[in-house]
Structure formats: C-alpha cells, structure tokens
C-alpha cells in the first residue's frame, strides 16, 4: 500500500528498506522480491519499546494539543528555531524511545512549547536517520517511508536531506 500511494510500485520488483512509523509501530523492514514474486519482508530494526507516534502524541498531550498530535505538533514545531534534538543510542538499527520521552519531558519544563515540539520531532528524526544509516551499511537500496509520523514535514525533510532522492 505504501509503494502504491508513493507511486513507487517499481520498488516491489527489487529490494528496498521500508519504515512504518506510526502510533502503533515503528519498524524498519528489508523488503525484496521473493522467488514467488511476492514481497519477502524481514524486520531489521525499529523501536524496542515506545512507537514514534506514541512519543509524539505524549509530547502533544503535554502541550495540550489534540489527539492524535502529530499534525499539530509539526505545525507548532515549524514556527520554532532549528533544534538539534536528543541523539539516541542506536544499535543494530534498534533504539529505545522511552529515554527520549524523558528528554522531551525535561525539555517541556525549560523551553517554549514550539521549541519542545521541535525537539521531539528532531529527536525522532535523529533515531530514524541513525537506524537507516546503519541499515544502509548492509543494504544499499532505496527507502520507502509510511505511517502517520512520516507526514511530519520536519522528519521527511531531514530524511530527504540525508538520503536525497533515495527516500519515497
């Protein structure tokens, strides 16, 4: 479905990395065309606890934003100054977001709402980019992104800046 909505059905004939980032899951898959012509998917990374969308919804809740909070959080964050975000530990394409949640909650105590929103989104982007970089050490193929979290202009821009035309 993600390949269809991105207009990238041609990816199904080869090999690619696929992120599904939402409130329910945050998984990085390696996908290749199987011998039977159907996609063969292997989960190679993602979160070990909290889904990316859960983290963003919790940040939005702290700010009093409507649920789900992704769109409103992104709009607020776009009004903020650029922010580096928290640099998570990523190992074998896997990372924990619960520690990032603590960082976001600490930022809430000390920063303006728009800066806290930006911090949360940049933190998720940092984790996703680092995991993707690790995956690309083994799999040199295009990247397909799906799920509500990838609707974020900030996260998508960061992915496109880092991986260029390789991201759909």
Task: Cite the ranges covered by each PLM segment.
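Active-site glycine-centered loops adjacent to acidic/histidine catalytic or metal-binding residues
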Residues: 1, 23, 148
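Short, acidic/small-residue loops that bind anionic groups at enzyme active sites
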Residues: 1, 47, 164-167
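Conserved phosphate-binding catalytic cores of ATP/NTP-utilizing and phosphoryl-transfer enzymes
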Residues: 1-16
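Buried hydrophobic packing segments
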Residues: 1-4, 59, 132, 159
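Conserved SAM-binding loop
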Residues: 18, 144-145
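A contiguous, well-structured pocket-lining segment that forms one wall/lid of small-molecule binding clefts
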Residues: 75-143, 149-167
